[in-house]
Amino acid sequence: MLQTKDYKHFCVGDVEFEGASAAAKALPGDRVRVEDGRVVEILERAPHRNIVGTLELASKYRYGMTSKNHPIYLFSPFTESYPPFYVGSAHKDTSQNVLAIIDFAHWTETCPRGNLQQILGVAGDLATEEEALAIQASPLRWKKLEALVSPTPIEAHMKGITFHVDPPGCKDIDDAITLNPLDGKTEVSIHIADVASWLLANPELMSKAEQIGQTLYRDGVAIRPMFPIELSEGIFSLLPGEDRRAVTLRCVWNKAEKKLEAFTWSLEMIRVTQSFTYHSVSKSMFASELEEICSGIANRPVTDSHEWIEQLMLLYNREAAKVLREKGAGVLRRHAGLDQARYDTYERLGLPADKLAMAAGEYCAATEDDTRHWGLGQDVYCHASSPIRRWPDCVNQMILLGHPANASIKHMNTRAKSFKVYERDMVFVRALLTNHDKTLKGTIAESGRIWIPSWGRIVKSDTIGFEPGSVVAIQYFCDATKRNWKRRLVLKLEPIETITSS
């Protein structure tokens, strides 16, 4: 399979080569045959659909006419792994470039031909740019669903007061909690929505959900859900007052010994009877017990209600990972830890080294030797607590329930990276298109890397003339000629002293 990040440097398996001409009109993802450092045959085209980019209507250049006598324009994909395309359009207003979606058609000319699927709007308009980034990150959407087959009924019903804790307005509710008093102890039940049973009863849902990978959120609102809304905010969701299936981790909090014991798993019916926000739960009848239990889980005082729920979900995921490891199936989450040299440098400069020098996590098979999650200090860890919004959790839930489940680890990691790119680009597009004062303060972290606290991230840029630790004033601009927001962001650095003395 042909792989490339820039359509200049290519690899197929262990063979690397350079130059677009050597790719011989193959596109990323195509199955190809390579001889002597070049593609000699395209064995199978990948489905190149939903390609997002800029249709250059405002350019003075045209590249011919279509069979319907429409002008052909240059289309520049956001993704640099694709070359520019020729795309015909009947759009009347050619005074401004537009953002559009195309599908690959064929490649017989200098550039591949694309079929225009949709014009999103004018390039440079914030709403249009945000929608384009969302489609780039998560291009697939659900169409109308057929009636679903219900899973086999289950008899076990949870007793007690079951509650969920989520932000106001949350509808895709993955998790709920039940605390039942025992003699000097507390039975703790962590319930996660049973999505797996619905998938097993309706396997047609699996393929598309896997391709989508996870729910995309904008400002806390699900804008491109992994499952159709009627499922993610309906029959899958642990909505108050509704009987719902749940995969439950149950254990007992021993108050005297300050520890959890007697862990068991079960599939059962629950009904959420109380809803809390993170603010209201801290004032509820459960607050003191949640604080005590979650402080015991963390082995330190935990007073923030957000972290109460976080600790319970971490516990669920740790215990699920142990089951997956024992079964030799499923998907774990590993983390390589710190770049020690970078950590030492950043700490010396007074930067948030724990965050900035941390390696990215990744998915791996439960059978691999190296599964250590350095950040959490766990030999095994997994994602299992959010099956409504994340595909690896669905795979792991199926295995927890005793069913086989196939998983493409590479695809999971690719999808996760796409969502990280979306988060980065949203910071850039909003900064460039909404802020009137385009001046920031930053710190040179190392050569070519600047820490910008107000953005909460490291940005790559030319730092020649500045030593690590230098505090700089940053003016930033948009170079609209570049393909994507990572390239469009242009920084100009000046020493703080120069700015303040002028």
Which sequence ranges carry the predicted segments?
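Acidic surface patches and DE-rich sequence motifs
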Residues: 4, 254, 452
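Structured C-terminal cores of nucleic-acid metabolism proteins
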Residues: 330, 336-502
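Exposed loop/turn and edge beta-strand positions of beta-sandwich/beta-sheet ligand-binding modules
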Residues: 110, 310, 438
